[in-house]
Amino acid sequence: MESTAAPSESPPEAASPYRDPEPFQVTAQGQEMCFFPSGSGRLERLIKLLDEAQTSLKLAFYIYADDGCGGRVRDALVAAARRGVAVSLIVDGFGAGVDDAYFAELKDAGGHFCIFGPKWKSNPFIRNHQKIAIADERVALLGGFNIEEDYFAPPEENGWRDLAFTVEGSLVPRVVEWYGQLEQWTSDPHAPLRNIRRRVRQWDRGLPPVQLLIGGPTGRLSSWAWTVTRDMIHGTKLDMITAYFSPAMLLLRRIRRIAAKGQTTLVLAGKSDNPATIGASRSLYRRLLRSGARIYEFQPCKLHTKLIVLDDAVYLGSANFDVRSLYINLEIVVRIEDRALADRMRAFVAEHIPASLEVTPALYREWATPWKRLRWSLSWFLVTVVDYTVSRKLNLGL
């Protein structure tokens, strides 16, 4: 674990003792939703989903590690396949540390396993960043977590602070439909990249108040990028938690306008396994603070949550708010317009603030020496133009 803040930047008194919130339920626009803020809650809900499936399981994850949690999930998938459940699993060829041999038992039991974009093919920087688990085409588990022990560890062990949610309702058939397209493309070793680009570009996001947005390398704005960009034109109240915050300048300007005419609260990472992502965010703080945005860096552990509340619209899913998640990686995001859900998720954002360090204009001026500003600008370049796997290897002394 590496903390990216020097002692003078995050004194112990700046953050209160933190405990993960308990699971909570919300019904919004006919969708029954349950949220799991704690790592243990996420893991137990995933295992329960796998253990109780009767007809089908459809999963896709970016990172799948060969560790205790990875083994537990694999064993549950094998058991499901052996009792007659149709099991399908997709992992990303770059993010996952497992291969066909790791899932030999699953395949022997009749399960289907495939890898999205194996390493070192053309266009190696495109990732399947989606996190999807669907049971019996009835309930979907979505969010930001991967299959690795770090994503289920508690804050005191510096586990990733993340969020997962189940949904039951009219949204689930749309998730099933998208998974089918993803699986069809991934299962064909000769499928050209333009095929998945076309699928992302032509995806029907549906009509408000409940929409399923898909992001990816379309050559133009995907349904995810187009919708959030449009919403920010007239937005007046923005609350956001995101692990990686380095948007394009157009979106930064729109966030600044929201802050100037209304209210903007950003809870961003104070710790990460990739210091460059924090530096990239800090390179934008000066302009945001000048516009009146409130910025907080979460202190207890690494932050991985992805949540946007913009007026009465709530965005939940796999996407960070950075160039890669907006324009390059495959992402899945649920958008629901519902005032009660928006109010509840704003309260959830607020629960992070006592455990966060507020970056005031005065504190920013203390941090922002010319040398640090140079390193932050370099970090922004690395995480927006290059790849996280490259920037993660560089210690910029942030």
Language model region names:
Residues M1-L398:
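Charged, low-complexity intrinsically disordered terminal segments
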